[in-house]
UniProtKB/Swiss-Prot annotation:
<dbReference type="InterPro" id="IPR002736">
    <property type="entry name" value="CitG"/>
</dbReference>
<dbReference type="GO" id="GO:0051191">
    <property type="term" value="P:prosthetic group biosynthetic process"/>
</dbReference>
<dbReference type="Pfam" id="PF01874">
    <property type="entry name" value="CitG"/>
</dbReference>
<keyword id="KW-0808">Transferase</keyword>
<keyword id="KW-0547">Nucleotide-binding</keyword>
<dbReference type="GO" id="GO:0046917">
    <property type="term" value="F:triphosphoribosyl-dephospho-CoA synthase activity"/>
</dbReference>
<dbReference type="InterPro" id="IPR017551">
    <property type="entry name" value="TriPribosyl-deP-CoA_syn_CitG"/>
</dbReference>
<keyword id="KW-0067">ATP-binding</keyword>
<protein>
    <recommendedName>
        <fullName>Probable 2-(5''-triphosphoribosyl)-3'-dephosphocoenzyme-A synthase 2</fullName>
        <ecNumber>2.4.2.52</ecNumber>
    </recommendedName>
</protein>
<comment type="similarity">
    <text>Belongs to the CitG/MdcB family.</text>
</comment>
<dbReference type="GO" id="GO:0005524">
    <property type="term" value="F:ATP binding"/>
</dbReference>
Length: 298
C-alpha cells in the first residue's frame, strides 16, 4: 500500500491546492483497492478475477482519468451552498456523466470505476460544501452530507414501475436490493458503522495495512447486498458469497500472510461461479479514503 506523504501545514494554503490534495487521496484509494491482492473474484495484481473484459492496467488508466475530475465535484459542492442539499445531486449528474465519459475513453469502453465515480463524486462534493461552510471535514460529516444530497433517490429511481426496467430497478423489485443508491442515501452505514471502525481497530492493533484491508473487504462482502454479485449469481450466489466471507471471518479472518491461502481459494471459487463483489470493492475504496481524510490539513 502506498504511504501518504506528509502534507503542508501552511495556514494560507489555497482551496485549489486543498482540492488537489483530496483528489489525490481519492486517486490513491482507487489504486490501493485494485492493487490489493488477492481479492475474491476481483481484478488485482494476480489475475482478473471473474472478469474477462478488464485488467489491472484498465483500472490504473481509469483512476488517472477520474483523478482530474474530482476537484470539479468539490468546486461544485462549494459553489452551491445556498441550495438545499437535496437539490445538489441534479447539478452533480452532468459532472458524473462527463467523468464517466473520460473513464470510458481511458479504458476503450470498459466500465472499471462507475460505482466509484458515484461515491467519490458525492463525497468530493460534500468536501467542497463543508469546506465552504467552514464545517468539520470528517468521515461522519462527509457521509451525512452525501446522504442529504441523495435524499429520496431510492424512491425516485428504483421504485418506479417502468416497462423497461434498469438492472438496478430489477434487482430492487426482485430482491429488495438498493445497491449504491441505497447505501449513499443512508449515509454509508456499512462503512461508518462496520468497515471503517473495523479497519481502524486492526491498524491500532498493529495489523499489516494490506492484511487489515483484506480482512475489511471480507467484512463488507459478508454484510453487503452487492448488486454486482446478485446480477451475476442471483440471490443464491449473493447468499453463498456472504456466508463464505462470514465463515472466513469467524475462522479468524486474515491475520497473517499464511491466511492468504484462504483468499486464493475463495478467489478461485468466485471465478468458477462468475461472481465479482464490485459493490464491496467500491465501499472498500470509500473506507480507505475516509480513513485517510485527516491526512489533509485544512
Amino acid at each position: 500500500m502506498m504511504p501518504i506523504p506528509a502534507n503542508p501545514t501552511n495556514a494560507s494554503i489555497q482551496p485549489r491546492s486543498l482540492y488537489d490534495a483530496w483528489a489525490d487521496l481519492a486517486w490513491r484509494a482507487m489504486l490501493t483497492e485494485v492493487n490489493l491482492s488477492p481479492k475474491p473474484g476481483l481484478v488485482d495484481r494476480l489475475n482478473c478475477g471473474a472478469h474477462k473484459d478488464m485488467a489491472l492496467a484498465d483500472f490504473h488508466r481509469s483512476a488517472e482519468a477520474i483523478r482530474h475530475w474530482l476537484p470539479r465535484f468539490m468546486e461544485y459542492g462549494a459553489s452551491c451552498t445556498r441550495l438545499p442539499p437535496e437539490s445538489v445531486l441534479a447539478g452533480l449528474r452532468p459532472l458524473g456523466m462527463a467523468c464517466e465519459a473520460a473513464m470510458f475513453r481511458a479504458t476503450a469502453g470498459v466500465n472499471t470505476h462507475k460505482g466509484s465515480i458515484f461515491s467519490l463524486g458525492l463525497l468530493c462534493a460534500a468536501i467542497g460544501r463543508l469546506y465552504q461552510l467552514r464545517q468539520p471535514i470528517a468521515a461522519e460529516t462527509l457521509c451525512a452530507t452525501a446522504a442529504d444530497f441523495c435524499r429520496g433517490l431510492t424512491t425516485r429511481e428504483l421504485r418506479q414501475n417502468n416497462l423497461l426496467l434498469t438492472a438496478g430497478q430489477r434487482l430492487y423489485q426482485q430482491q429488495g436490493l438498493t445497491g449504491a443508491r441505497g447505501e449513499a442515501e443512508a449515509g454509508y452505514p456499512l462503512v461508518i458503522r462496520h468497515a471503517l471502525p473495523h479497519y481502524r481497530a486492526l491498524l491500532a492493533q498493529g495489523r499489516d495495512p494490506d492484511l487489515a484491508l483484506l480482512d475489511t473487504l471480507l467484512l463488507l462482502m459478508s454484510l453487503n447486498g452487492d448488486t454486482n454479485v446478485a446480477s451475476r449469481g442471483g440471490a443464491d450466489g449473493l447468499r453463498w458469497l456472504q456466508q463464505h466471507a462470514a465463515f472466513l471471518l469467524h475462522q479468524g479472518g486474515i491475520r497473517t500472510p499464511d491466511d492468504l491461502v484462504y483468499l486464493h481459494r475463495f478467489d478461485q471459487q468466485c471465478i468458477e461461479r462468475n461472481l465479482s463483489p464490485g459493490g464491496s470493492a467500491d465501499l472498500l475504496i470509500v473506507t480507505w479514503f475516509l480513513a485517510q481524510i485527516s491526512q489533509v490539513n485544512h
